[in-house]
Amino acid sequence: MAVCIIDHDNIRGVIYFEPVHGKDKVLGSVIGLKSGTYSLIIHRYGDISRGCDSIGSPEIFIGNIFVNRYGVAYVYLDTDVNISTIIGKALSISKNDQRLACGVIGISYINEKIIHFLTINENGV
């Protein structure tokens, strides 16, 4: 299992890469983006010393996520990515080829857990 913590400006989230019922899944949630569709992309390097400018070229398109009107995206995507090959690389959240936030993909301790998703009510709270 792998995990990526996103914490860039006001954009925050946790993205997990893990096998679920024999299929690799991308799970998590992201907050702080404007409503719309964004891309999750794996990049060549896990170097975030200069933010998203130092993560290298895009390598793997994971899929699109939709951010609701409250600025929340719930992530649940299928992927064919071999999880062991992405450890140490970066994951970016992008729109129109602009990298808005990124984080390094690391190894996550394998244990039984429940993933809690952030929920926002109709009042944005």
Curated annotation (Swiss-Prot):
GO terms for molecular function: metal ion binding. Transmembrane segments: none annotated. Its main location: virion. GO terms for biological process: superoxide metabolic process. It is found in: Virion; Host cytoplasm. One of its GO terms (cellular component) is virion component. Disulfide bonds join 52-102. Keywords: Disulfide bond, Host cytoplasm, Virion. The keyword Disulfide bond applies. InterPro entries: SOD-like_Cu/Zn_dom_sf (IPR036423). Signal peptide: none annotated. Superoxide dismutase-like protein with no enzymatic activity. Belongs to the Cu-Zn superoxide dismutase family. This is Cu-Zn superoxide dismutase-like protein OPG175. It comes from Vaccinia virus (strain Dairen I).
